[in-house]
Amino acid sequence: MSAEFITLVVAIGLAFVASFVLFRDGQLKGKSIDRAAAKALVERIIIAESNGDPNAKNKGSSATGAAQFLDDTWLEAVRRHRRDLIQGRSDKGILDLRGDAELTRDIAARLVEEHAAMLTKRGLPVTAGSLYLAHFAGRGGAVALLSGAESADAALVMAAADMTGRTTREKLVNANTFLKAMTVGDIKSWADRKMAAGTRPGRERLR
């Protein structure tokens, strides 16, 4: 085992522990989440999504990078928040930026703040778990899951929330096999566990 590998493992572990402390202490204020808490939560999301690997790729979907951003989500987010990066770049060039760990963290933190405001506006809980659901399932998917019947099929609820009609239960399960038998209640508990204190860093799945 190389010294570089050991250093990476230690760094990931320290980042995870630090993120728990920061997010625990960060306040969720009305329609927003403070920037420190958003950044702290992003560290936990990254551990859950890819174990911190900026080159992670899901073979079943377009999810790429440390935060496992889908193509459409990343393109929209960069165009909205970092227009300075668009000039002179093709869509492929913009998508390749998902390999930039710091940019990924910046974009993810901005989206966490947006998700918190959206959930608050809809009267839904703003917790580490609900914010992770918004990252994982998208805003529409998170709203549907947080508002849905506990016994409903989670993948069906997520697919139905996609207004474009491009998402199907089959596609979701192919990319996330653990969803096959999950109910809405199951996935909410899963998200809470993934973001909870004491969760062991490690790659459970890639979206």
What residue ranges belong to the model's regions?
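Export/targeting segments at the very N-terminus of extracytoplasmic proteins
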Residues: 2-56, 98-123, 195-206
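Extracytoplasmic
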Residues: 40, 64, 126-128
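Short, surface-exposed glycine/acidic/tryptophan-bearing loops
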Residues: 57-88, 151-156
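Alpha-helical segment that forms one wall of the substrate-binding/catalytic cleft
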Residues: 71, 75-132, 136-144
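Catalytic and substrate-binding regions of cell-wall glycan-acting enzymes that process beta-1,4-linked
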Residues: 129-184
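Low-complexity, Gly/Ser/Thr/Pro-rich intrinsically disordered linker/tail segments
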Residues: 174-207
